[in-house]
A protein has these predicted regions:
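Acidic, polar-rich low-complexity tracts and alpha-helical solenoid repeat scaffolds
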Residues: 1-239
Length: 239
């Protein structure tokens, strides 16, 4: 049951009563019921501190209820309505988390599961948006208590997106689509230069250019690799 048994009793509820009931549902993990109660609170008492807190917790409840689009919409609304609120950093954080989780399923699959050709456009977009959300949080609120976690997630996202380029480049190599493989690997080097993916990206470029008989480009990639990764096990695999 999403709402208390006797809905008509809510006619007499104060803002505090709505809030405490919603918070109880939230704490119990009944997120859909909490969202309804926060909505009722805001409809009845749209102004003031409690309504603002309800808006913020609505974003959190949607996030916990696996409704990333609704969580992002609620967080965006809070940021727009209350840009100088003392807890507005949390809205930025929830927005980033919602996009992060939206991209996480595909990321985990790419990192651990069978080879996929590519990240879907949606997952790639969610990763990029999550990165931008966290970047905005740490730029605007460097002292925020959420900033350290945001920075860690940014580092993870960059590595994961770079690795997705490598997975795709490997796929193209297996298909003997050497130009596509070289382009993907080159993109990983250019866009994500300080990630673990760079080492293998250079190796793929060397292989692809060799197959294409583009020897100058092959030699350039190998030179960069020997300078930056002199102990790379990939170098041992080169002819």
């Amino acid at each position: 049951n999403l709402l208390p048994d006797r809905t008509e009793d809510q006619q007499d509820w104060s803002a505090n009563k709505f809030y405490s009931e919603a918070k109880e549902k939230l704490n119990d993990g009944n997120f859909a019921a909490a969202i309804k109660l926060y909505g009722s609170l805001e409809a009845r008492y749209p102004y003031g501190r409690i309504a603002q807190q309800a808006q913020l917790e609505t974003a959190y409840a949607h996030y916990k209820n696996d409704e990333p689009a609704s969580a992002i919409a609620a967080a965006d609304r809070f940021i727009k309505l209350h840009p100088n609120h003392v807890n507005v950093d949390y809205a930025y954080y929830i927005r980033g988390l919602s996009n992060f989780n939206d991209s996480w399923g595909m990321m985990g699959f790419l990192m651990k599961g069978p080879l996929k050709q590519d990240m879907s456009e949606r997952d790639s977009k969610a990763s990029q948006e999550s990165f931008e959300n966290f970047k905005e949080l740490v730029t605007r609120f460097p002292e925020s208590k959420y900033a350290a976690d945001a920075r860690q997630r940014m580092a993870y996202l960059i590595n994961a997106v770079a690795m997705s380029e490598i997975h795709t480049a490997r796929y193209y190599m297996k298909r003997k689509a050497y130009i596509a493989a070289a382009n993907r690997a080159q993109n990983a080097v250019k866009e994500y230069p300080r990630t673990p993916a760079t080492e293998e990206a250079l190796y793929i470029m060397i292989q692809a250019y060799e197959a294409l008989e583009m020897y100058d480009l092959r030699d350039d990639a190998e030179r960069v690799m020997r300078i930056n990764f002199p102990d790379s096990h990939f170098l041992k695999e080169l002819p």
